[in-house]
């Protein structure tokens, strides 16, 4: 049964939650540790600004690049703090823009870096 780590960060911007479990994608056969790592106030502030400005930002915006790097670091810390081997990480990243009526959504988070620094392949870009 695949060992997985699920990561969650929401628009509350309070931090990243992580949970380890064994599942085939339909049935959970074992639950492991879980944790929350709160974002520092500066990252929380910067993410709020990005949420407010997202519709006018470009991918190369320095504020966005900086926030994405810091946000990814929190996700890496969460995976490593669980101290459990995993075969897969569920990583939806941080939503900064969601306009379903316009078929538009944007998440930030560096899945390639998450894979490199944890040694575990993430399932990303789920939207």
Question: Which role does the model predict for each range below?
Answer:
Residues 1-127:
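Short acidic/glycine-rich loops and adjacent helix/strand connectors
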């Amino acid at each position: 049964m695949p060992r997985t780590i699920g990561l969650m960060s929401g628009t509350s911007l309070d931090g990243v939650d992580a949970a380890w479990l064994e599942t085939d994608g339909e049935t959970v056969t074992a639950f492991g540790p879980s944790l929350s790592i709160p974002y520092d106030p500066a990252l929380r502030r910067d993410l709020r600004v990005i949420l407010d400005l997202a519709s006018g930002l470009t991918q190369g915006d320095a504020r966005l690049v900086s926030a994405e790097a810091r946000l990814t670091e929190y996700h890496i810390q969460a995976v490593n703090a669980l101290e459990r081997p995993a075969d897969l990480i569920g990583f939806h990243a941080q939503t900064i823009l969601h306009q379903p009526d316009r078929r538009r959504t944007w998440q930030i988070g560096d899945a390639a870096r998450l894979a490199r620094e944890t040694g575990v392949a993430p399932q990303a870009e789920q939207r």
